[in-house]
A protein has these predicted regions:
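Short, small/polar-rich motifs associated with maturation and membrane association
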Residues: 1-265, 277-279, 337, 697
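Extracellular/periplasmic, surface-exposed regions of secreted and cell-surface proteins
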Residues: 89, 267-276, 282-286, 319-321, ...
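Short aromatic-centered micro-motifs
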Residues: 92, 737, 747, 774-776
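Outer-membrane beta-barrel proteins
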Residues: 97-139, 160-165, 209-226, 245-281, ...
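Switch/connector loops and helix/strand junctions flanking conserved nucleotide-binding motifs
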Residues: 123-125, 143-144, 157-160, 289-291, ...
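Conserved small-residue
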Residues: 148-203, 666-764
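Extracytoplasmic gating/loop element in the C-terminal half of outer-membrane beta-barrel translocons
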Residues: 347, 732-739, 790-794
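Glycine-rich, aromatic-lined ligand/substrate-binding cores of catalytic
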Residues: 377, 763-793
Length: 794
């Protein structure tokens, strides 16, 4: 479903086009390695999930799509590959707080930046070491009034579907497989003829069902409308966005899955005095999903695994009445089943009930900003608190209608008869029940004092910041609490040489005692070569900068709570005759009070430039990260006879390195035509250096030295009979095999192919990701083309 056709209507009082030649002076003076995303590109990609639109948009950002039903098919972000053999996901920070990116619309966003090196990530605490997607929402501008309205309607056609066998060909090939296995054919010649002449989905004895044709539409729909209002004056500024998004699924039978979502955001800035201003940001999202008894994922699972002759959709009253005492008339709803499947997909989709999900999310930021330049030149401060609330409710109604499997047997006279066996009974609940519900709350407060001052050729700055967050969720036995204090100092001489150093004290209640805290640091420097006298007069070079950074960062992202504590539980009662017995206590897990933070040592070396009056720009970075102290279970250290209560330890180590690069060319032809061509590429390569693994196993079996996403399996030598003779081949211990089956290699030459012969046969994470984009604008009309590719997944 990758091809999408959209009709886009838009009207606005203020129109702004993105131009690739815009110079970001803040980026020019920065040491941090940051990729920036063009927000206009995201608006051009109509997708329910904003995360999906970021694929191919930035060097260093790897976007892996997830599968799921309507509203669930989002994406996971990775920054510069996989850093660990544990969790590798990057976090998303929206207006200073970690929040889901799919909760907002692209129309709400002012900027998206991908923070990639230690110098950029250290400011965001214990979760940020895997990378940060930094999102800032729009704010009003004094004297600039904007009203924008946009509406879209799109159709997403199915581009390709698998082709499955019909009942006749399925039965024919199944018989052939039986004969190959030395068994008798299952289907008689009469059965084969019956399938060849089948009347279709309701043929009682010989049904023939094309599930994709019967249950799927040829396209789904997408709809969207947004309204943006912003403006203000010197005293007050505002930005308001309201949006509706909706989509309908591919289901042809029964209730079509449907999603309706409303987003609203209001950002307000008020100047109270000459040095004090306040901000209030409020956002809300209400989402409603409705579908039948099966969501899209459940339906696809069924239609891709049911046999074409599994069962008839419906059984007529005439066929079943009187059998086994069954009473039926023309009003009866009776459905087919099989010995393998007691439920009937047609019945489930048409009459099986319904499911509804409700999401209500709210996000609030309240802040104060202090411009203290009047008192101390270059001094400013800010503080804000945040409160987010997420609630979820799922309700469902499940109906069961009678289903019957159909078998044939010979009666006492030797005649063939039909037997109906009830597999499901009639069950019609009167109202929906609550299937699940949850609540998640997030509280945080942030404070920062910053000082920037220039003294002739010298630019100096300092920044002290504190972040505190607390999270609580339904069903969680422990609230997560984390804090991060950072101090950064930077210095630049004559706009040519820049130095930066950052210290951070991180804290997390995932650990115990002194191990609750981790002390991180980063240093970096940059040389703006284009500002040197030997390049200053070269008109073709607008910017040429080299930069390097190194950092030592901590990570506590996916560490379980209470790993420091030994856990027990009440066990079974033991009987000691003649007494009545006694309760026992079982050891669940040994604690490790010395468990420490994971940490990474990161190096980045890069060069960036802009040339030819800023028409050509590009950046290349080499990165190397060594992640240590990765937490895991070191079962190789303990005898298996000891039980399954091994403590967690800091045992893992992963080396990750690679290159990311981007290049852009933007220009104009005449007064009305502008274009931009962009390319970004990310290459990553990692290997596991330490893990839970025995040292005395064969080298080909070791995961150490392999990528963290390595796939292990048996190595094929070809097919028996064609490439390899069965006679003399080592015994394969995992099932019967014959001519035509796959022959696997006996790598340890012990005369048997078993689990000890598994080796690396591929990897699941891409080595290289590529994005190519083309943007064309002519007299207010625009065309955006994006191509993406990945390599290395085998």
């Amino acid at each position: 479903m990758k091809n999408k056709y959209h009709i886009f209507f838009t009207g606005m009082l203020s129109i702004a086009f993105f131009m690739g030649a815009t110079v970001d002076t803040k980026a020019q003076d920065s040491i941090a390695v940051v990729s920036r995303v063009n927000i206009e590109h995201l608006k051009a990609m109509p997708d329910l999930q904003l995360s999906n639109t970021l694929q191919g948009q930035a060097a260093g950002l790897i976007v892996i799509p997830n599968t799921g039903g309507i509203g669930y098919a989002n994406s996971t972000f990775y920054v510069r590959g996989q850093h660990s053999n544990g969790t590798n996901k990057a976090i998303v920070i929206i207006d200073g707080i970690e929040r889901p990116i799919d909760d907002i619309l692209p129309e709400e966003i002012e900027s998206i930046e991908v923070l990639k090196d230690a110098s950029a990530k250290i400011l965001y605490g214990a979760q940020a070491t895997n990378g940060v997607i930094l999102v800032r929402t729009k704010r009003g501008q004094a004297g600039k009034r904007v009203i924008r309205f946009g509406a879209e309607y799109g159709v997403q056609p199915v581009t390709r579907l698998p082709e499955y066998l019909d009942s006749y060909n399925y039965a024919t090939l199944f018989n052939e497989a039986c004969v190959n296995d030395g068994l008798l054919p299952l289907y008689s010649d009469a059965d084969l003829q019956g399938y060849r002449n089948s009347t279709g989905v309701n043929d009682l004895l010989h049904p023939n069902v094309d599930y994709y044709k019967e249950f799927l539409r040829s396209s789904s729909t997408f709809r969207k409308a947004t309204l943006e209002l912003s403006g203000g004056n010197a005293r007050a500024k505002y930005a308001v966005t309201v949006g509706y998004t909706g989509s309908s699924g591919l289901e042809k039978v029964g209730d079509r899955s449907d999603l309706n979502r409303v987003n609203a955001r209001g950002n307000l800035d008020i100047r109270i005095t000459d040095f004090l201003s306040a901000s209030a940001d409020v956002a809300a999202r209400v989402e409603k999903k409705d579908w039948g008894a099966k969501d899209g994922g459940g339906m696809f699972s069924e239609i891709s695994t049911l046999r074409p002759n599994e069962y008839p959709f419906m059984i007529s009253a005439e066929d079943i009445h009187g059998h086994n005492g069954i009473a039926a008339d023309e009003t009866s709803l009776l459905f087919g089943a099989s010995s393998r499947k007691s439920s009937n997909l047609y019945s489930d989709m048409l009459y099986g009930g319904n499911t509804s999900e409700r999401y209500v999310n709210s996000q609030t930021n309240l802040g104060l900003n202090f411009d203290l330049n009047e008192f101390v030149e270059g001094l400013a401060a800010e503080a804000y608190i945040t409160f987010d609330n997420y609630s979820y409710l799922r309700q469902q109604l499940r109906n069961d209608y009678p289903t019957y499997s159909i078998d044939r047997y010979l009666n006492a006279a030797g005649d063939e008869e039909i037997r109906f066996t009830e597999r499901k009974k009639l069950n019609l609940p009167k109202k929906q029940s609550i299937a699940s519900n949850s609540t998640y709350r997030y509280f945080g407060w942030n404070a920062r004092v910053k000082y920037n001052r220039s003294f002739g050729l010298h630019d100096m700055g300092a920044n002290a910041a504190f972040r505190y967050t607390a999270e609580e969720a339904t069903g969680s036995s422990q609230d997560l609490k984390e804090g991060n204090f950072t101090f950064r100092a930077n210095y630049a001489y004559n706009k040519r040489y820049m130095l930066e150093a950052t210290l951070a004290a991180m804290g997390s209640n995932r650990f115990q005692g002194d191990n609750k805290y981790f002390f991180a640091h980063s240093v970096g420097g940059a040389w703006i070569i284009s500002n040197e006298s030997f390049l200053k007069d070269m008109k073709a070079v607008n910017l040429l900068k080299m930069k390097v950074s190194y950092g030592h960062l901590g990570y506590a992202g996916d560490t379980d709570f209470f790993l420091h504590r030994t856990n027990w539980r009440q066990g079974d009662k033991e009987e000691f005759k003649p007494s009545t017995g006694a309760n026992t206590t079982d050891l669940i897990r040994l604690g490790n009070p010395d468990l420490k933070w994971e940490y990474s040592n990161e190096l980045n070396i890069g060069i960036e430039g802009r040339f030819l009056n800023n028409r050509l720009s590009g950046e290349v970075n080499y990165f190397r990260e060594l992640r240590k102290n990765i937490i895991g279970i070191n079962s190789a250290k303990y005898a298996t006879i000891g039980g399954n209560f091994i403590p967690s330890e800091n045992i893992g180590e992963v080396l990750n390195q690679g290159i990311d690069a981007c290049v852009n060319w933007n220009d104009k032809v005449g007064e009305d035509f502008t274009y931009n061509l962009g390319l970004n590429i990310t290459f990553t390569k990692n290997k596991l250096r330490k893990t839970n693994e025995l040292s005395n196993i064969e080298d080909y079996r070791k995961s150490i030295g392999q990528p963290t996403s390595a796939i292990f399996g048996w190595q094929s030598q070809g097919l028996f009979g064609k490439d390899v003779a069965i006679a003399g081949h080592p015994f394969q211990s995992f099932g019967n095999y014959q001519v035509g089956d796959i022959a696997y290699a006996d790598l340890n030459n012990d005369g048997m192919v078993d689990n000890n012969d598994q080796t690396r046969i591929g990897q699941s994470f891409p080595k290289t990701t590529l994005g190519v984009d083309v943007t064309l604008n002519y007299k207010g009309f625009g065309l955006y083309i994006l191509g993406t590719a990945t390599t290395g997944v085998t």
